[in-house]
């Protein structure tokens, strides 16, 4: 065991303390039949320079594709200041504090995150963050059930299918009934929603922009929810709020979403960042942590964890949620991103997403064999249909250096051969034109 920095004399002292003479005696209870009995078949050790060269060779095998994929996870530009500040040891190594008032810096960072989410959504209070957008939506549904004392949730079919799957998992354990609202031309059918919104409904969930990128009639849908004395729950893309109306403006009671777009890379699927914002009347029903601002005994500003109705602090059956952690580091990244971009910066990002997506949609829809599926207004995602299977299109595009065309038929059988394209501010006109040229060649 040469990798352990002990001398032979020190090893003998430790063996003597164990009542052994040789190292092998420590493993005497391991049958000989299961022992290896030979040296490990490992290559020779490498010098540091050799390791770097080997890793570069492995990295060189990766395929770098220009991405036009989205469907809930988006590639946005991240200012360098985000990574620089995030990597500071004061933040990077700190878990959510168990003696919170000692960690005033961490609590202030979370407080700033909550404040920014409230400003984005136009609502009164936000939590310290959640695991991801899907769990945030499911938790909001439980808030609606607790607040109204009803056990039925209406959720539009235009909401991200993976979010709906997580919601279904939550609902089974809580005895919550789910009903899906059908679609009309890629958006929630408001007439169907009005018929479904009865006196037993606790909440109505819509996504804006929805999974197809379409802009929903959120004000009308929220009004229908309120007529049934249910809560209106909006699932939003935070970047889109640089241009679109905030949930608070159209009367939503709760706003949830995925914060990955705010300064967090794609990370091969995680960790991501869920957020929940709500009206003040719901503050005591919110899950997880909330950081509040107060004054200490000397009258100085101080931050505390407040309203911790979590299963770790009270009787489990009385808790509002089993959520017992958050995504503080990812929330810090979102906070730094929003502070760096500012109001006008976020508006510029949203504007570029909108303009570039419409440019790409116009170019692609003009190709022979390509048909736009929906005609409503959209933000930065759109749906096109081709004569080829989505798998064929995706494979051929990958051969041309593009990751594009999410297969909607996976979740919507009626959308066979329909592809979801996403364009964010990081894509250039040249990349969009190259995608169009590649599609033209594939469909020829």
Curated annotation (Swiss-Prot):
SUPFAM superfamilies: PLP-dependent transferases. The keyword Zinc does not apply. Its EC number is 1.4.4.2. Gene3D superfamilies: Aspartate Aminotransferase, domain 1, Type I PLP-dependent aspartate aminotransferase-like (Major domain). The keyword ATP-binding does not apply. Keywords: Oxidoreductase. GO terms for biological process: glycine decarboxylation via glycine cleavage system; nucleoside metabolic process. GO terms for molecular function: glycine dehydrogenase (decarboxylating) activity. It catalyses: N(6)-[(R)-lipoyl]-L-lysyl-[glycine-cleavage complex H protein] + glycine + H(+) = N(6)-[(R)-S(8)-aminomethyldihydrolipoyl]-L-lysyl-[glycine-cleavage complex H protein] + CO2. InterPro entries: GcvPA (IPR023010), GDC-P_N (IPR049315), GDC_P (IPR020581), PyrdxlP-dep_Trfase (IPR015424), PyrdxlP-dep_Trfase_major (IPR015421), PyrdxlP-dep_Trfase_small (IPR015422). It holds the Pfam family GDC-P. The glycine cleavage system is composed of four proteins: P, T, L and H. In this organism, the P 'protein' is a heterodimer of two subunits. PANTHER family: GLYCINE CLEAVAGE SYSTEM P-PROTEIN, GLYCINE DEHYDROGENASE (DECARBOXYLATING). Belongs to the GcvP family. N-terminal subunit subfamily. The glycine cleavage system catalyzes the degradation of glycine. The P protein binds the alpha-amino group of glycine through its pyridoxal phosphate cofactor; CO(2) is released and the remaining methylamine moiety is then transferred to the lipoamide cofactor of the H protein. This is Probable glycine dehydrogenase (decarboxylating) subunit 1. It comes from Moorella thermoacetica (strain ATCC 39073 / JCM 9320).
């Amino acid at each position: 065991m040469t990798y352990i920095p002990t001398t032979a004399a020190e090893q003998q002292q430790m063996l003597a303390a164990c009542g052994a003479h040789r190292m092998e005696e420590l493993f005497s209870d391991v049958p000989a039949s299961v022992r290896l009995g030979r040296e490990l078949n490992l290559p020779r050790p490498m010098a540091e320079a050799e390791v770097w060269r080997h890793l570069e060779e492995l990295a060189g095998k990766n395929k770098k594709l220009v991405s036009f994929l989205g469907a809930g996870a988006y590639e946005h530009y991240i200012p360098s200041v985000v990574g620089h500040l995030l990597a500071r040891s004061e933040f990077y190594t700190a878990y959510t504090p168990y003696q919170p008032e000692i960690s005033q810096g961490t609590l202030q960072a979370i407080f700033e995150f909550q404040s920014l989410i409230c400003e984005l959504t136009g609502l009164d209070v936000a939590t310290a963050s959640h695991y991801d957008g899907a769990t945030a939506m499911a938790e909001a549904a439980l808030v609606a059930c607790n607040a109204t004392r009803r056990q039925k949730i209406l959720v539009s079919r235009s909401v991200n299918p993976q979010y709906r799957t997580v919601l279904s998992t939550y609902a089974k354990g809580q005895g919550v009934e789910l009903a899906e609202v059908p679609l009309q031309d890629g958006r929630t059918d408001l007439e169907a929603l009005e018929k479904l919104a009865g006196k037993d409904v606790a909440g109505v969930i819509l996504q804006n922009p929805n999974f197809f990128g379409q802009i929903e009639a959120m004000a009308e849908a929220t009004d229908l929810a309120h007529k049934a004395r249910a809560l209106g729950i909006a699932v939003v893309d935070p970047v889109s709020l640089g241009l679109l109306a905030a949930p608070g403006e159209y009367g939503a009671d709760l706003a949830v979403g995925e914060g990955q777009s705010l300064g967090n890379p794609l990370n091969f699927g995680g960790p991501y960042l869920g957020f929940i914002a709500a009206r003040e009347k719901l503050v005591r029903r919110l899950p997880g942590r909330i950081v509040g601002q107060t004054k200490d005994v000397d009258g100085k500003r101080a931050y505390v964890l407040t309203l911790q109705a979590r299963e770790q602090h009270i009787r489990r059956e009385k808790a509002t949620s089993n959520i017992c952690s958050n995504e503080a580091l990812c929330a810090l990244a979102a906070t730094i991103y929003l502070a760096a971009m500012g109001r006008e910066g976020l508006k510029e990002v949203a504007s570029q997403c909108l303009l570039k997506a419409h440019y790409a949609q116009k170019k692609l829809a003009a190709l022979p064999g390509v048909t736009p599926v929906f005609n409503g207004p959209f933000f930065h995602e759109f749906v096109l249909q081709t004569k080829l299977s989505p798998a064929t299109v995706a494979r051929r595009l990958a051969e041309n250096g593009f990751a594009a065309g999410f297969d909607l038929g996976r979740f919507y059988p009626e959308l066979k051969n329909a592809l979801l394209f996403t364009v964010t501010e990081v894509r250039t006109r040249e990349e969009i034109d190259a995608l169009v040229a590649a599609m033209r060649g594939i469909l020829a």
